[in-house]
Amino acid sequence: MTWLPLSHSYEHTVQFIQIIVGAKVFYAESLEKLISNMGVAKPTIMTAVPRFYQNLFTKINMNFEKQSGLKRKLINQTLNLGKKILKKEELKLSEKIINLLCEKLVRKKIRNQFGGNLQAFVSGGGALDQNIGEFLNAVGLPTLQG
């Protein structure tokens, strides 16, 4: 799935790779319709520049900040446990159980908003802020620096 113009140097390079490996390429109608287009295309990989992921980070955080009570605690646990897993830290039994809840109640819902099949976001054309990459991975959106 892509939304960058074909004239963009990163997108141009990625297009060649996609052609070489025989991948299907879906083009979003516009940046505003990207998420709804992802629901239709159900992409497995999406490439974009760091600015896209910064905006996504901001929007997800704005949504998280609106939550309160149990939802807010579950979101915080999702982030904390996701970061521990990313750093390959051992989870206690209680954390493993909570993480299962986070997977079903938070991460799965987030992944479904992006079509449900997303295997990886790939950021390229510049450096992705490490905190943004960690955050996206922690909430269930595997993000790689290309």
Predicted regions and their residues:
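Conserved AMP-binding
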Residues: W3-H8, G125-A127
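Conserved AMP-binding/adenylate-forming
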Residues: M46, C102-G146
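Short catalytic-loop micro-motif centered on adjacent basic/acidic residues
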Residues: M1-T2, V25-Y27, A120-S123
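Conserved AMP-binding/adenylation subdomain of ANL enzymes
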Residues: L6-K104, N117, P142
